Amino acid sequence: MFTGIVEEIGEVTTLNTTSPDGGTTLTIALPPTSTLLSDCHLGDSIAINGVCLTVTTFLPQSFTVGIAPETLRLTNLGSLTPSSRVNLERAVRADTRMGGHFVQGHVDTTATILSKIPDGNAITFRFAPKNKDVLRYVVYKGFIALDGASLTVTKVNDEEGWWEVMLIAYTQEKIVTAAKGVGETVNVEVDMTAKYVEKSIQGYLAGMMEDGQGLPWLQKMVERIVAQGFS
């Protein structure tokens, strides 16, 4: 579990697709002054661009993780190259301040940057998700994790299939997204609370339908929505 508050920006040194163990490994170097690995242990979880990965080896200023094929298919990690910069966050502890929101490190899809527009010293980014199904979990003023950074949705358009976030000057210095351009991608994890709410409502409605109570309730809801729409 993570908070979406990026702790450090690391730099890719190697992305090895022919690791001796048959998998893909990714090695990240840290700035000389970084203390990110000061309490690191083998097997610890670290989010790299929002993807929860397991530390397999580490030195004081670098570490290596293994990447599963499914992770490469669902995320933008496979497009990383030496010198690519990535967002890093350690897993939360019991005493961690929740400065962002609950982030699992389980990426739902990627999104492409459609536009990048300065607004004073802030920047507004517009994103279109590869998997449009995630849009039902994206709401105005809601949380969304982009490359692991907890951000607030400032605008969303379900019909056209995009949402926007705004990065203030401080945030631009702390995450890699600010340096990305139109056409580049970010990893997306929607707020898991929305998924739990959807699952609960689906179960509740299914139970009502089995009891024969669901149809009248649904009819009343539709009538109310129609009445509001034409009032």
In which residue ranges do the predicted regions lie?
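Conserved loop->alpha-helix
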Residues: 1-231
